[in-house]
Amino acid sequence: MTVPRTGRPGGIRAAAPSRSGWRTQAPVVAVVALGGGTGAAARYAASLWWPTPAGGFPWTTFGVNAVGCAVIGVFMVVITEVRPAHRLVRPFFGTGVLGGFTTFSTYAVDSRSLFADGRLPTGLAYLAATPLAALTAVWLAAWAARRVLKWRQS
């Protein structure tokens, strides 16, 4: 049997998704969309509650990203080490809610704006501090969650 060649790398055409594949993926897509809308609404609420002044340091975006990363640190410990979750919990909350809440695209835009406004030291500090804060938040939150769980079990 020969496979039709295409202009794609390797020249092999991808198989069309089966009907059963769509049926199993539709709930995942739906919960990611629902969670994403929820997370984005929460981020928008944070920007209204804690607005960034024109030309100021983007503390809201910085805080949202750090908090979102801390929450995902706790969430991953709970669903991987404590109690397995329903198959839609991780895509809803981890990918959807937290993906919609955190905003690394706005981080990039904020960084570019700081540089464009001639605020090089602030832009560089923000550019370096955000991923450092995000990674530290994930690590510390996961560590703290494990400590609390160990303490509760003893």
Swiss-Prot record:
Keywords: Cell membrane, Ion channel, Ion transport, Membrane, Metal-binding, Sodium, Transmembrane, Transmembrane helix, Transport. One of its GO terms (biological process) is cellular detoxification of fluoride. Na(+) is not transported, but it plays an essential structural role and its presence is essential for fluoride channel function. One of its GO terms (molecular function) is fluoride channel activity. Pfam families: CRCB. It is a multi-pass membrane protein. It is found in: Cell membrane. Fluoride-specific ion channel. Important for reducing fluoride concentration in the cell, thus reducing its toxicity. Belongs to the fluoride channel Fluc/FEX (TC 1.A.43) family. This is Fluoride-specific ion channel FluC 1.
